[in-house]
Amino acid sequence: MHYALRNRTSTGLKLSHTGFYMETINAFSDEDLKKLVGTIFTENKEKLLKWPAAYKLHHAIRGGLLMHTLSIVKLCEGVCEVYPFVDKDLLLSGAILHDIAKTLEFNVGETGLANGYSVEGNLIGHLVMGAMMVREAADKLGTDKKREMLLEHMILSHHGEPEFGAAVRPLFLEAELLSELDLMDARVYQIHEAITPLKEDDFSGRLWALDNRKIYNHGLADNKKDVDLD
């Protein structure tokens, strides 16, 4: 899969990438999180192959939502190797579900591109709707209330600051890590998209999503390399 996609209607994602999620979920030792995350993911996996992660910003391409969340899951696995005191099942649960309600937030056509926000997307937004999805599934499954609450908090706080849409700031380690990794993946995508068309030593135009910065292509990296999500 290549970030600098010339064809915004194809990411190269396929059903096997949703299978990776189920393998990840089935490896959880926490049975409550395994059932909860597995249920919600299974109900939405067909949409994930098509849905973009944004209307206009990062990963605003067909399958971009799956691409973005899969990137974060991979990053979470690396973080947990370095920091063994992190609750891996909880962090991965938040990574898999943090943007799941974007399947409700956007109106998406056959091309897999968002053509606007749904009524629910405008009035409620994907953070709150995601927490609502967790609560509804948890109630049906009889999920442990503490685990339900922690996962809801991770979804509600993953934008980091209220000015960026967070309902609350991250208040425990796994929530903080999810917020930082979400931001990192979005910015890597945006910067890579900005510099790939540029010649060496050129600057992009000012990018609103990157604090109105102009991004520099130093020319030392191979921007044509694919993102490794397999």
State what each model feature region is.
Residues 2-121, 161:
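Acidic/His-rich, divalent-metal-binding segments that scaffold phosphate/diphosphate chemistry
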Residues 22-29, 41-45, 52, 155, ...:
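Generic secondary-structure transition motif, activating predominantly at the C-termini of alpha-helices
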Residues 52-55, 61, 65, 69-70, ...:
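Solvent-exposed, flexible loop/coil residues
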